[in-house]
Amino acid sequence: MAVQSYAAPPTPWSRDLAEPEIAPTAYVHSFSNLIGDVRIKDYVHIAPGTSIRADEGTPFHIGSRTNIQDGVVIHGLQQGRVIGDDGQEYSVWIGDNVSITHMALIHGPAYIGDGCFIGFRSTVFNARVGAGCVVMMHVLIQDVEIPPGKYVPSGMVITTQQQADRLPNVEESDIHFAQHVVGINEALLSGYQCAENIACIAPIRNELQRQEDPPTLHVEMLTGEKNTMTTDYGTHVRQLLQQGYQISLEYADARRYRTSSWQSGPTLTGQQESQVMAAIAQLLKEHEGEYVRLIGVDPKAKRRVFEEIIQRPGQAAVASSSSSRPSATVNASPVGSLDAAVVAQVRQLLQQGYQIGTEHADARRYRTSSWTSCAPIQSKQEPEVLAALEACLQEHAGEYVRLIGIDQKQKRRVLEQIIQRPQGPVAIAPKTPTPVATSHASVSSGGNDTLLSADLVNQIQDLLRQGCQVITEYADQRRFRTSSWQSGIKITSAQQINDLRSFLAEHQRDYIRLVGVNPQAKQRVLETIIHRPNGKAASNGNSTRGQGFTPRPTASSQGSPSTHSLSQEVIEQVRQLLQQGYTLGLEHVDARRYRTNSWQSGPRIEAKNLNEALAAIQACLQEYSGEYVRLIGINPAGKQRVAEILLQQAAK
């Protein structure tokens, strides 16, 4: 199940866009909410409905084998830190083997020691709870330090240190109760992980199905019947048996086959080749019209060494000449409506040992790059992967679907390619899989595509080559005047520049700017407007090649706003005000009020560079056409005006 985790939003106190760090063995339910610098260690269980937000106080630490139950809220203040067991500062530290139960509130600065139990609806704020404490239900702990091994009865309000020091010690029965709750949640953790593992859940489903529908046995003599196994498969069975491997079978109907949900068949324990072949022939006959595959298992290493489909609906057993070792390729024709380029891309990924995954998003989520993971494709066989891929495209018709190539050893993505849009499938050219942090794929920007200029495409590629993160932001005309930008899509590889074209098409009436972020320095290195409501994209000639992390927009490039109504003197004054650190504002007045000097405050211009300031001024001049408009320069330190410049006079 996909984990819903987000980077911390940019705020006045934090602009590092930190994201959660989740250990591979931890289980985080998709209905939980993780934001910011949250560090989750091994075997942590986070239940649905929890909210862990490190967007103000940061970072958070959640120790190994800790369970966070439904409805828990963990948050922190901008100021205030605690010292964790590793000697570092944290907004919230939760130790190992801690149980935080339903509806509890942990608000930093807060420290919860190892082995603690926090009861239902209890609150810990600006406090330290020592190791081994048992806090019961509806308790408030604030501004105190609870010594280790203390028991806090239900309903108590602990707000003074004298109250904390007088608390009784934990008794044996309290420890047993806390251990009982922890044990239950560890069992839940194992159960949730098993439910997402086909190999674990399949035998349980098969057992339930056998209990509900007892099979009717039909024993028939095989003598005189034509054996459905081919000579090639007889060779494979013989080789597997000679090497000491076990042979088993799996089967699936057409619906389960599309989701790679195979059902386990019998394990053939006999060592006689004739007995094994007879058993396989019997199973093929029983499951006629279904998919059946042959499995070779190494009993010592407890892993599969061979997988091959030997029967398909409407076909006889499939011959194969592959050897008895894990196989990543099967020559097959394209499945259904899949584009030949998609099939070639999948084949290339499988040949290199990568795992295939898919993600989908509707038009609204696509604009914010909020992709949802589809059912995992565990198979390494090309026909099975293509069938599952086609089923995913059919299931999510009318949505965006992208193909993911995953390097399981390095635990990183090597390919992200959109293969379907709401209008239909996408024609793609096969690309060599590379880590998504790099970009050497060529992207066309000329010809019939007028949304992106060649300079802009080159600039994006330069930023990616330098290791920068590339994101987009957009704003309508009203928000643009106040510089209130909203987050758009994130571009992690040159292959996603097509996504940028779609994003520009969807926001034709908005301002869109491109942002380059240095992830190491955690600062923005580029902000440039690439699209305006008139539909024109900026022709960005400011390439970052050879400049390290120092690209900066200039007033003469990057799509600078039209300044035909502003004199060069005014532009120079605006530049000087910005360079001196002054803030800009506007005031407007009609002709009648102008005579009495009764100016009305306009929007405040929170621009970070000359481009944005001039664009915002132009937008205001258009909005207040026919009125007097003047620019105000304000010294934020002294809170006084340093300049008043008349920009526009009322029409007479």
Swiss-Prot record:
Activity modulation notes: Carbonic anhydrase (CA) activity is probably under redox control to remain inactive in the cytoplasm. CA activity of full-length protein inhibited by ethoxyzolamide, and for both full-length and CcmM 1-209 construct by reducing agents.
Family annotation (SMART domains): RuBisCO_small (SM00961)
Keyword field contains GTP-binding: no
Sequence ranges of Polar residues compositional bias: 537-566
Cofactor(s) for this UniProt protein: Zn(2+)
Enzyme Commission number(s) from the entry: 4.2.1.1
Catalyzed chemical reaction(s): hydrogencarbonate + H(+) = CO2 + H2O
Location relative to the cell: Carboxysome
GO terms, molecular function: carbonate dehydratase activity; structural constituent of carboxysome shell; zinc ion binding
UniProt-annotated stretches for the region Does not have CA activity: 1-193
Region annotation (RbcS-like repeat 4, CcmMS4) ranges: 565-649
Cofactor-binding details, from the entry: Binds 3 zinc per trimer.
Gene Ontology CC: carboxysome
Entry keywords, A to Z: Bacterial microcompartment, Carbon dioxide fixation, Carboxysome, Disulfide bond, Lyase, Metal-binding, Photosynthesis, Repeat, Zinc
Region annotation (Has carbonic anhydrase (CA) activity) ranges: 1-209
Ranges for region Disordered: 530-566
Positions of the catalytic residues: E56
Top-level taxon: Bacteria
Disulfide bonds: C194-C200
Main enzyme class: lyase
Region (RbcS-like repeat 1, CcmMS1): 233-313
Binding-site residues, Zn(2+): H75, H102, H107
Similarity comment: family membership: Belongs to the gamma-class carbonic anhydrase family.
Quaternary structure, from the entry: The N-terminal structure crystallizes as a homotrimer; zinc is bound between adjacent monomers. The C-terminal RbcS-like domains bind to holo-RuBisCO. Full length protein interacts with CcmN.
Function comment: Functions as a scaffold protein for the assembly of beta-carboxysomes, initiates carboxysome assembly by coalescing RuBisCO (ribulose bisphosphate carboxylase, rbcL-rbcS). Produced as a full-length and a shorter form; both forms are required for correct carboxysome assembly and growth.
Name of the protein: Carboxysome assembly protein CcmM
